[in-house]
């Protein structure tokens, strides 16, 4: 298993939601946009996780609760440090999502890779109660019938309401 690519400044990243090809934020993974990236292939997590679509903005959330849910299918990329930092900023790591190493199996070769994956470490119970069923794969136009709301639109709505997505989603620390 390998965590980094051939160069020390390159990392494997697994994306499962709106960053996948054909999804609303696919441009983030484009090579040269905030760093270098290269598509490696499709993959599936070795362990199951809860993947849901929830909140009024229909955001896909991978909950850090291994062993529950389903094995998740997604895409693996090799990224440089600049792209990894850009992804950390996008995912608000470590304040909202956390970036952890998980093992995936590449679909084409059957090879296993340790990859970085962004997960929600804690959440309010309402996130599950109001969310979709556990998914194995996310598609913004999927059978869950929950159309994704773009970031700029939800930021405007949250600002008008006077709070943030973190307040809506994350369980307060005790």
Residue ranges of model-derived segments:
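Glycine-aromatic micro-motifs
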Residues: 2-174
């Amino acid at each position: 298993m390998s965590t980094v690519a051939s160069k020390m400044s390159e990392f494997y990243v697994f994306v499962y939601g709106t960053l996948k090809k054909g999804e609303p934020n696919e441009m983030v993974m484009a090579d040269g946009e905030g760093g270098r990236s290269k598509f490696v292939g499709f993959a599936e997590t070795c362990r199951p996780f809860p993947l849901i679509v929830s909140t009024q903005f229909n955001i896909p959330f991978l909950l850090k609760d291994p062993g529950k849910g389903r094995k998740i299918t997604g895409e693996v990329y090799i990224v440089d440090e600049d792209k990894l930092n850009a992804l950390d900023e996008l995912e608000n790591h470590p304040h909202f999502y956390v970036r952890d190493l998980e093992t995936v199996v590449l679909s084409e070769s059957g090879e296993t890779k340790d990859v970085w994956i962004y997960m929600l470490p804690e959440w309010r119970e309402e996130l599950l109660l109001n969310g979709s069923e556990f998914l194995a794969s996310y598609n913004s136009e999927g059978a869950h019938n929950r159309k994704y709301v773009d970031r700029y639109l939800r930021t405007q709505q949250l600002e008008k309401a006077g709070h943030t997505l973190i307040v809506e989603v994350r369980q307060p620390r005790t």
